[in-house]
Amino acid sequence: MSYPEPRYHGESGEVGTAALRRVDEKPELTNPSGTTVHYLATGASTDGEFGLYRWNFGPEPSGPGPHFHRTISESFFVLSGVVSLYDGARWIEATPGDFLYVPEGGIHAFQNVPGEAASMLLLFTPGAPREEYFETLFEVANGRVLTEQERADLFIRHDNHWV
């Protein structure tokens, strides 16, 4: 494997292009279960390179069932608590420092342990526009009702294929 073709062609580097997100910034999303999501780096802000999100679970059970993506890989890094990660074959009780990489097509799922808070990082590559998907799911958790067709369209548009 080799390095990709250069995307920056300058000679002296750039000043002012880095982006900082402070830990105390408010989350972009909150749902009734107490789960919050912080958009650390979106596909738009990384020019499509990746999307990185901090997912803080509240004590109520939360997380998607088994699914896969055709166009993006997804990785999980547990920061605190216990997160149940499904690797397509079994559920794994992941603890701080545990990491799971799921390539395109890999079946996976995640959920917190009921009654316990937990936190993890979600990394998508390339940086697909996952924000609309997350926002719609949080709207549904907050009472929005989707028709079956709207739900099906949402999943197809955002490369979410349930198994």
Where are these regions (language model features)?
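Short acidic-glycine-tyrosine-enriched beta hairpin
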Residues: A89-I107
